[in-house]
Amino acid sequence: MTYRRGSQSTTALVGCSLDVPEGGWASLLGPSGCGKSTLLRILSDIVKPTSGKASLGGRSPAQARAERAFALVSQQSVMLPWRKLLANVELGLEVMRTPKAERRRRAEEAIEQVGLAGFERAYPFELSGGMRQRAAIARALTLRPRFLLLDEPFGALDELTRERLNFELLRILTETSATMLLVTHSISEAIILSDTVAVMSARPGRISHVAQIDFGHDRSAAMRDDPRFSAYEAELRHAIGGEPQRHAA
């Protein structure tokens, strides 16, 4: 799959195929520059490939966008500084010309869902980084997407906040039944948040390894103490090329 930037054509992805069942959770891992974020931008119809094709639920990215089938959350929360939290969360619905009463109801519901009730009138500068990312997820949830595309949404946060938000996101995914595709550099985050972890090789990116994470959808922080967690970490680190694979005794 190639795409063009100005006069330069770049082959970003080769033979990338990953099937995620409806309601499933999948992550993409791999070295910087391997095409993980490019794949997400192609799926969200931001970048148009000049060869190859991509699909979401059997629809082209353009069709999926027209049907509002997906929502994208990136590492930058992109909140308008002059709008309060509630107004920022309503923004996507406002662009869609959703009636005011309906967008207010859906925004308040999403704010409650991400644990920000009581902060509706706060400006972005009054919120922590973790709270701003939760607001970005709330804005995505107001669209009621079938597919939630996440491009390192917690990458700029400290480790403790990141892990707490991982488990909050698990709760939200369970409640909404959305299908999730996450781009991350964190092996532990991929294990916590995924049923399927796909490892991508260096550019041109291809899926070189797929691991099935057998923890079910009822997860908690205790999963870190499960011997399987360490085994998955070793498997994925080996697949990325970080170190030889070790097997638990």
What is the predicted function of each stretch?
Residues 2-15:
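A short, flexible loop at the N-terminus of ABC-type nucleotide-binding domains that lies
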Residues 29-31:
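The feature captures the beta-strand-to-loop junction immediately N-terminal to the Walker
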Residues 44:
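Helix-to-loop junction immediately C-terminal to a conserved catalytic motif
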Residues 52-62:
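Conserved ABC transporter NBD signature motif
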Residues 94, 101-119, 171:
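Conserved ABC ATPase "signature" region
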Residues 122-125, 143:
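Conserved signature/switch motifs of ABC ATPase nucleotide-binding domains
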Residues 137:
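Hydrophobic anchor residue at the start of the ABC signature
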